[in-house]
Regions:
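Function-determining surface determinants
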Residues: 1-316
Length: 316
């Protein structure tokens, strides 16, 4: 319930590194608001529109920056490198202009400064939000989590998601499953990890390394009485799948981008492959590796059915 007010906290805890994560959490909290309440509509629209726009711009900049960084190892020709620099500069300029237009930064003489104006606008929108009771919120979240799990399972079993496409298939699937962990984290103590490893169907994921990972922790809120649980092993398993698919996808998109760029500058595919070395991963391999990971978790291990059953049990 009051977790939505932590949007204000998130807005004041932006990090130079991994700054998309707070924006994902802001979007998650906005998506959880009741759209049937008229007073929520303005806040939802403002928060989603702005946070999604900035997050997309940062994503494009991150990709351009990763290519530029990678080229320190790949050492493509000056012609290719110059194009990489142009792409990086364009992404940086687009992000900067976006933040200027939104009032998040101001441009002075030879300096970029933080500006409160854009954040004050978002915070003003929060004043209009109507919150459910803590008990009602728990039920709504459990139902949402269960529905997400069942929908994802159905999408794969009935092939509603085309996994032969990297961006519109594999990456879209990853986006969908990632919301579960983002919701759980953004709710700041409303969702906690279960503590029954002996009966956890994902108990093989309950390892010291997973338990110690900063990405696998959820806040504890002693004041929250109507909590719900996420299977501990299931949360770790989901995180592992998200991470694996992200690595596979990034490698594939990097190869695809540099293949297009390199060949446009007269390089042969073999020369590009040689430059990339172990970072080379063609489309077929990307699709194969990602599909194997997805099918194993969804079809063989029935991962989302198990997660859905756990949430369903708490609705009883």
């Amino acid at each position: 319930m009051r977790h939505y007010r932590h949007i204000k906290t998130i807005l004041h805890n932006r990090s130079v590194f991994n700054c998309r994560t707070p924006l994902f959490k802001i979007q998650a909290l906005a998506r959880l608001l009741d759209r049937k309440k008229k007073k929520n509509i303005r806040a939802i629209s403002a928060i989603l529109s702005i946070s999604k726009t900035v997050e997309d711009m940062i994503g494009q900049f991150d990709f351009a920056a990763s290519i530029l960084k990678g080229n320190e190892k790949w050492q493509f020709s000056d012609e290719v490198r110059n194009q990489i620099l142009i792409q990086y500069g364009f992404a940086l300029g687009t992000l900067e202009e976006c933040l200027l237009q939104l009032g998040w930064i101001t441009r002075g003489k030879n300096v970029i400064q933080f500006d409160d104006f854009g954040f004050e606008y978002l915070k003003s929108a929060l004043k209009e939000i109507s919150f459910p009771s803590s008990k009602k919120e728990k039920k709504q979240i459990l139902q949402l989590f269960k529905n997400i799990c069942m929908d994802i399972d159905e999408d794969i079993r009935e092939k509603k998601i085309d996994l032969t496409h990297i961006e519109d298939g594999i990456h879209e699937f990853r986006r969908d499953i990632r919301w579960l962990s983002i919701y759980a984290s953004a709710l700041r103590g409303k969702v906690i990890l279960s503590n029954n490893p002996e009966t956890d169907p994902f108990q093989h994921f309950i390892t010291p390394s997973n338990m110690e990972s900063r990405y696998n922790t959820l806040l504890i809120n002693e004041d929250e009485k109507n909590i719900l649980t996420f299977q501990q092993g299931g949360f770790y398993a989901l995180g592992a799948l998200i991470s694996d698919l992200g690595n596979i996808k990034d490698k594939g998109l990097t190869t695809e981008y540099l293949m297009q760029l390199g060949t446009s500058k007269g390089m042969s595919e073999e020369d590009i492959k040689a430059k990339l070395g172990e970072d080379y991963q063609d489309v077929a391999t990307t699709i194969q590796q990602a599909t194997e990971k997805i099918n194993q978790f969804v079809l063989e291990e029935e991962g989302f059915i198990k997660l859905a059953n756990h949430f369903e049990a708490q609705l009883q």
